[in-house]
Amino acid sequence: MPENEAKIRLDRFLANKLPEYSRSRLQQLVRTGFVRLNGATTRPRHLVRSGDKIELTEAPLEKIDNQPEPIPLEVLFEDKDIIVINKPPGLVVHPGAGHRQHTLVNALLSHCPTLSGIGGKERPGIVHRLDKETSGCLVVAKNDGAHRELSRQFAERRVEKIYLALVAGKLSKEAGVIEEKIGRHPVHRQRMSVASARGRPAKTDYRVVCSGDQASLVECRLYSGRTHQIRVHLHHLGNPVLGDKVYAAQLAKNFPRHMLHAWKLGF
């Protein structure tokens, strides 16, 4: 354990070093004894220290037990290693609490029965995510080699991620950079905030594509991937995404969902 990386949670340390694994998957490996700290089992929240020895035993890949569902998919690109999907709004990416069926994973298993198992049984092939109501480009790994390579590129911030957002009002500048840190809201735990004392670095470039009296179309380029990053940063500017029930509920009633689309994905 290098001294400059000491005193952080074990699961966070592992997530930084092993981007191909989701944090929930790593927490599961710690709890089930596949990760040992100084030869002993431990807990995901244990704070690692300089000089600690961490051992990870490769766990067998989990058998995928989600059921295929014939949900139509718009495939933008596909080869033997990856699939790029234009995800529709309203579709949850992977099964979780409250969404055990009718997800993108169920649709993918119908389209392509073999997917990478690195993400665990609930997230086969899933390398990154989009919020339920966000539409647009999402890449999925068909095999473990593709999963590891894509995860590495995302972790190294080499993936180009460009979004289009329809926001309220006119922006004060035609283009700019937002670098406010983002963390969990101190009171509303389902929200993220730039006011969090434990915020993590986040960077969003933006450019106004066109604007009218009441709304603007904005192109946003992400250099990090914090939860709700674009929605939080644009809300911070005073130009929230239209239709956003979480950050601008008063402006959401006339829209079926928040107006955010993952336009381009380059890797």
Task: Report each predicted region and the residues it spans.
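RNA pseudouridine synthases
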Residues: 1-267
